[in-house]
């Protein structure tokens, strides 16, 4: 039996060698394929886990953004009420002063200015914090993912984070003061000549707000002619000049250099067309919500209904400006409310804001950021 098998192998030696080579090759290729498949599966699993981890970190970061906005609204409201103190004027009016008309005129300008500034500054706060916290969130994610690997140092240590995020004070300080000045001038120009006895409908109010917005948003547009995509409102959120830290160009510490880098990246983001579009969308939603809040006071009376006025018409009910002033004056408590109001919730939950935040986080949480 063995001799016949041996003779068979000798007679078909080349065929057997060829067959053995083929079978061996198939075996080796099979093993190699299994190894590669295992590597691909492991890599895909690692990428999936990393993506899931990054998605979880992003969603957690957005919740932090929302809570931070709500926590800062009382500070914003207090700053506004301090700069535009209408309460002192209403207190004076209760004493029936001889210059009552003059006080009413002042109250008209301050009330409208305060509510309009509240809308602008709240929208700016929402979008600016989205940018800042997603930039720093991206850095923190990279720190958590890479620290200690290959001698990688921390990109954004806690002291840098604190120093960077403190730049929001510009919006709550000098930026807000300048915004108040510009809006007050616009309100004076549009509403200053309108008599307190003159009646306005909700549609009239909407038109006046549009005219005021046009003046405010064109105030610095001539400065931006070279870059039409840049928002004219950036100046109120970050100063045009380099940050005060840049004045320390001699002997900057590594921490200061990192902070300046973060601030410059933020400035670039604020000057982008996407930021301008998102902020403008927020402002449109904000002023629409402001009018919705005031619409409650423009409901037709029984007498209006008897005369056949349309309930749904924005121009069916008109109120004297003197009666509209208290309505406008109280809007700050709805706009700058730290308890989730319809106004703030609308801004925080806008899809455009969410998408923009995701793009910012994506840009600053990728490994390529380490190479910059």
From Swiss-Prot:
Q: Where is this region: Interaction with PEX19?
A: 120-136
Record's subcellular location = Peroxisome membrane
Regions of this protein lying in the Cytoplasmic compartment: 1-15, 141-372
* Membrane-spanning residues: 16-36, 117-140
Do the record's keywords include Transmembrane? Answer: yes
Segments of this protein annotated with the region Targeting to peroxisomes? 1-45
For this UniProt record, the keywords arranged alphabetically read as follows: Membrane, Peroxisome, Peroxisome biogenesis, Transmembrane, Transmembrane helix
Topology feature Peroxisomal, residues: 37-116
Query: What membrane topology is given?
Result: Multi-pass membrane protein
Highest taxon, organism lineage: Eukaryota
Write out the similarity annotation: Belongs to the peroxin-3 family.
Purpose? Involved in peroxisome biosynthesis and integrity. Assembles membrane vesicles before the matrix proteins are translocated. As a docking factor for PEX19, is necessary for the import of peroxisomal membrane proteins in the peroxisomes.
According to UniProt, the name of this protein is Peroxisomal biogenesis factor 3
Q: What's the source species for this entry?
A: Rattus norvegicus
């Amino acid at each position: 039996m063995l001799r016949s098998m041996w003779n068979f192998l000798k007679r078909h030696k080349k065929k057997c060698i060829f067959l053995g080579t083929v079978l061996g090759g198939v075996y080796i290729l099979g093993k190699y394929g299994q190894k590669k498949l295992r590597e691909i599966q492991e890599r895909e699993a690692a990428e999936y886990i990393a993506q899931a981890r990054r998605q979880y970190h992003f969603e957690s970061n957005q919740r932090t953004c929302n809570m931070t906005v709500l926590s800062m609204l009382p500070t914003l409201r207090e700053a506004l009420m301090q700069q535009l103190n209408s309460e002192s004027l209403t207190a004076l009016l209760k004493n029936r002063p001889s210059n009552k008309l003059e006080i009413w005129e002042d109250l008209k300008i301050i009330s409208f200015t305060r509510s309009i500034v509240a809308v602008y500054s709240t929208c700016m706060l929402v979008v600016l914090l989205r940018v800042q916290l997603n930039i720093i969130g991206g850095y923190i994610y990279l720190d958590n993912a890479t620290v200690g690997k290959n001698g990688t140092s921390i990109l954004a240590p806690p002291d840098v984070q604190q120093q960077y995020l403190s730049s929001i004070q510009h919006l709550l300080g000098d930026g807000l003061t300048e915004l108040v000045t510009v809006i007050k001038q616009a309100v004076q120009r549009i509403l200053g000549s309108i008599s307190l006895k003159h009646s306005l409908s909700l549609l009239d109010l909407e038109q006046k707000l549009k005219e005021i917005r046009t003046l405010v948003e064109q105030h610095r547009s001539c400065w931006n002619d070279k870059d039409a995509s840049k928002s004219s409102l950036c100046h109120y959120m970050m100063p045009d000049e380099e940050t005060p830290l840049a004045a320390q160009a001699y002997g900057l510490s590594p921490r200061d250099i990192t902070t300046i880098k973060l601030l410059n990246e933020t400035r670039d983001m604020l000057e982008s067309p996407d930021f301008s579009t998102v902020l403008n969308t927020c402002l449109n939603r904000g002023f629409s919500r402001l009018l919705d809040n005031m619409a409650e006071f423009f409901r037709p009376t029984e007498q209006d209904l008897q005369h056949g006025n349309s309930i749904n018409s924005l121009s069916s009910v008109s109120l004297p400006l003197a009666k509209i002033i208290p309505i406008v004056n109280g809007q700050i408590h709805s706009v700058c409310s730290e308890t989730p109001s319809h106004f703030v919730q609308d801004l925080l939950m806008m899809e455009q804001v969410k998408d923009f935040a995701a793009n910012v986080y994506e840009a600053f949480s990728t490994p390529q950021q380490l190479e910059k």
